[in-house]
UniProtKB/Swiss-Prot annotation:
Signal peptide: none annotated. Belongs to the methyltransferase superfamily. PrmA family. One of its GO terms (biological process) is methylation. The keyword Methyltransferase applies. Methylates ribosomal protein L11. HAMAP family: Methyltr_PrmA. GO terms for cellular component: cytoplasm. The lineage of its organism: Bacteria, Bacillati, Bacillota, Bacilli, Lactobacillales. It comes from Streptococcus equi subsp. zooepidemicus (strain MGCS10565). Its EC number is 2.1.1.-. It comes from the Bacteria. Keywords: Cytoplasm, Methyltransferase, S-adenosyl-L-methionine, Transferase. The keyword Transmembrane does not apply. This is Ribosomal protein L11 methyltransferase. S-adenosyl-L-methionine binds at residues 158, 179, 201, 244.
Length: 317
């Protein structure tokens, strides 16, 4: 019987996607993310709210490697990646890293047990790719393969981004998705009526994952995925730019975003932990944007900025 090696790492929530990416780059065949924040106010499949759980700033990420892989080499590679993240001032918290062997049938079933369909917004529901799910009238389905990494799409930062897209998209827009990761925001943009979506990520793994997830969904031929370093070198104008990435990186997006966004267009920024909110907000204001909406879930923030000369309807306008 073929065995798998299960490696579990506990890190600060802010580093969730960056560390997930490290695990995939080290050869993981799937990643499962357990975050207590995902259950706040969420209903289970029977319509009942999940019981109250103790909240923590830490999340647990579980990765799976073939039995033939050298787990000591993998741990060394991951530790080197974690050290690089520390040098970039990414908050990792008190790290723990453990591993164990797992039988084939346990691997096949265990990681899928983490994931169920989740209604995220009024219109959008995220459904694991293997689930037979029948949509209700008006419900828009985003199919994802969580085993490809980047979680399930139910993290608060993703939820806030989806709420923001639902708020600003009216149909016919051009959208740029910065740091696309799983591709969930690009898929949502298309489902919400965007005419064209351009998705970029610096990481080759993310580009592949996004393309694979987009292929799981209907009517997504209007999504174009490519490798790219934030918005550097782009000339394509957009009505909406959405970026759900680390706050320390968001501050480097605002100037290029202002250059590319059309008049009366929107910049959506998520992934902002509360202690770094003012830093990100000021970077966007300095670039020329006006703040229209501030959304908060737990310690996570999302901001909707508008490129406009009309001060009515904006915060402080």
């Amino acid at each position: 019987m073929k065995a798998w090696q299960e490696l579990t790492i506990t890190v600060h929530r802010e580093a969730e996607e960056a560390v997930s990416n490290l695990l995939i780059e080290a050869g993981s065949q799937g990643v499962a993310i357990n975050d207590t924040a995902d259950y706040i106010g969420q209903e289970d499949r029977f319509g009942e709210l999940y019981p109250a759980v103790e909240q923590s700033e830490m999340v647990t990420i579980t990765a799976y490697y073939p039995s033939s892989a050298d787990i000591d080499d993998i741990r060394q590679t991951i530790n080197q990646g974690l050290n690089r993240l520390k040098q970039c001032d990414v908050e990792l918290g008190e790290l723990t890293l453990t591993n164990q062997e797992l039988a084939e049938e346990d691997w096949a079933d265990n990681w899928k047990a983490y994931y169920e369909p989740a209604r995220i917004t009024h219109d959008l529901t995220i459904v694991p790719s293997w689930t037979d799910y029948e949509a209700t009238a008006g419900e828009k389905i985003i199919r994802l393969d969580p085993g490809m990494a980047f979680g399930t799409g139910t993290h608060p930062t993703t939820k806030l981004s989806l709420f923001a897209l639902e708020q600003v998209l009216r149909g016919g827009e051009t959208v740029i998705d910065v740091g696309t990761g799983s591709g969930v925001l690009s898929i949502a943009s298309s489902l919400l009526g965007a005419k064209e979506v351009f998705a970029y990520d610096l990481d080759d793994v993310a580009v592949r994952v996004a393309k694979d997830n987009i292929a799981l969904n209907q009517a997504t031929d209007n999504i174009h995925v490519a490798a790219g370093d934030l918005l550097k070198g782009l000339t394509q104008e957009a009505d909406v730019i959405v970026a759900n990435i680390l706050a320390d990186i968001l501050v480097h997006v605002t100037a290029d975003a202002y250059r590319l966004i059309k008049s009366e267009g929107y910049l959506i920024m998520s992934g902002i932990i509360s202690e770094k909110l003012d830093m990100v907000k000021q970077a966007a204001l300095n670039a020329g944007f006006l703040l229209e909406t501030h959304m908060l879930q737990g310690e996570w923030n999302a901001l909707i900025f508008k490129k406009t000369d009309d001060l009515s309807g904006v915060i402080g306008g």
